[in-house]
Amino acid sequence: MTVLMSPDELEAALRAVGAARYHNRHPFHQLLHGGKLDKRQVQAWALNRYCYQAAIPIKDATLIARTDDSELRRIWRQRLVDHDGTQPGEGGIVRWLALAEGLGLDRDMVISERRALPATRFAVRAYVDFVRDRSLLEAVASSLTEMFSPTIISERVSGMLANYDFITRETLAYFNARLDQAPRDADFALDYVKRHARTPEQQQAAIAALTFKCDVLWAQLDALHHAYVSPGLIPPGAFGHDGIWS
């Protein structure tokens, strides 16, 4: 029989998920941060990651539309502003596109997502569907990977700047804002989960939701590693298939 945890015990259980399963542990990220990839492999990462970045405000808008809690809507909508901005040319998606262009990728090609890996698109779609279909508590809990993102951001920025001569601080400007945004968002979401997971079943559902989100992020890197590192099997139509890197 599952025992009801205290809020602090629940937080510890959630953090243990990240310690074991967050994608900073993935071999592809270790290669990326360690300077072991070539430019085309880094381009493939940026192109595929765009699919995830572009889906985040869709996921957040889906969550907002589901709740009758006005406080939750007010606070959560800041995430839309962070990613979409308040006018054209602002927001995290625009900054990610600048990163992609800084790596030499065509902006329209990236936006179209037509050269992304099928597994990337499937994983991203699964995340949006999860937030739409599962309980509101699970939807909020699935965002808690942001508890762990400051660590991976600092590793990524320092490692990529040190190891790749084709990357500059301007290229990686996207991550500057996320160092403040992610902890703010995670603090609110964690407090929400600790207050609303009131039964053992709800607590286990929250832990499972965070586990699922870690799996979504891990699966995207599995696909990148399989296509662009080993065994190097790029699917038809994807970036680099048949030697076409555009």
Curated annotation (Swiss-Prot):
Classification via SUPFAM superfamilies: Heme oxygenase-like
Class of enzymatic activity (EC top level): oxidoreductase
Assigned keywords, A-Z: Oxidoreductase, PQQ biosynthesis
Catalytic activity field: 6-(2-amino-2-carboxyethyl)-7,8-dioxo-1,2,3,4,7,8-hexahydroquinoline-2,4-dicarboxylate + 3 O2 = pyrroloquinoline quinone + 2 H2O2 + 2 H2O + H(+)
Cited InterPro entries: Haem_Oase-like_multi-hlx, PqqC, PqqC-like, Thiaminase-2/PQQC
GO term, biological process aspect, one: pyrroloquinoline quinone biosynthetic process
GO molecular function: pyrroloquinoline-quinone synthase activity
Entry keyword annotation includes Transmembrane: no
Record pathway: Cofactor biosynthesis; pyrroloquinoline quinone biosynthesis
EC number, UniProt record: 1.3.3.11
Keyword set includes Transferase: no
Domain of life: Bacteria
Function: Ring cyclization and eight-electron oxidation of 3a-(2-amino-2-carboxyethyl)-4,5-dioxo-4,5,6,7,8,9-hexahydroquinoline-7,9-dicarboxylic-acid to PQQ.
Family: Belongs to the PqqC family.
Protein's recorded name: Pyrroloquinoline-quinone synthase
Gene that encodes it: pqqC
